[in-house]
Regions:
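Hydrophobic alpha-helical interface/terminus motif in multipass membrane transporters
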Residues: 53, 79-83, 108, 112-113, ...
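Hydrophobic alpha-helical transmembrane segments in multi-pass membrane proteins
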Residues: 76, 80, 135-136
Length: 188
């Protein structure tokens, strides 16, 4: 399989994950900011790879598969790191909501694809807003030590907003898929 520029950027995003994990755990005063910077770079590549794939007409099945996987890995790893570091309700609850939603929607998309109705659960604008809120919250939280500061509280608030958007988008996806989830007359 030949690798084009958008796919290479997506692979780079996955390869940046262990780097930001390592930076997060380094015992230096600058490590949180460095980890956050690498995470921000990885988040920016999410926009860049999609833009280039469309602009250069280089969309591929591999890129369509790997892009959402890279996003989910990046967000889940960041949330796990932060839950471990902060160990409080204000971070754990939205993290559980966000990770849980990603599992539910990934399974729903897989199942809908098997039914030939994948377009019913395509990415929406609300999903894009949810992703933006998550990324900004995670960049802020990764950049700061787990202390009760203005920036950490702002990160918690943004993550709660992201969790709310996450639930709202999940409800929209489930409503769109509902006609396919109901039993047919022969299944009753």
């Amino acid at each position: 399989m030949p690798m084009n520029i958008p796919n290479l950027i997506t692979v780079l995003r996955v390869l940046l994950i262990p780097i930001f994990i390592l930076l997060f755990y380094l015992p230096y005063h600058w490590s949180y900011m460095a980890a956050s910077s690498v995470f921000a770079l990885a988040a920016a590549t999410d926009w860049l790879d999609g833009y280039l794939a469309r602009r250069l007409e280089q969309s591929t099945p591999f890129g369509a598969f790997l892009d959402p996987v890279a996003d989910k890995l990046m967000v889940a790893v960041a949330l796990v790191l932060l839950v471990q570091a902060h160990a409080n309700f204000w971070l754990t609850l939205p993290a559980a909501v966000i990770i849980g939603r990603e599992i539910v929607i990934s399974a729903l998309r897989e199942w809908m694809a098997e039914l030939g109705a994948r377009a019913q659960v395509a990415v929406s604008n609300l999903g894009k807003w949810k992703t933006a809120a998550q990324m900004v919250a995670l960049i802020i939280l990764l950049a700061n030590a787990p202390a009760f500061t203005f920036w950490v509280v702002l990160g918690y608030v943004l993550l709660m907003i992201a969790a709310g958007l996450t639930l709202w988008s999940m409800v929209q996806y489930l409503r769109a898929a509902w006609p396919h989830l109901r039993p047919t007359t022969e299944e009753k």
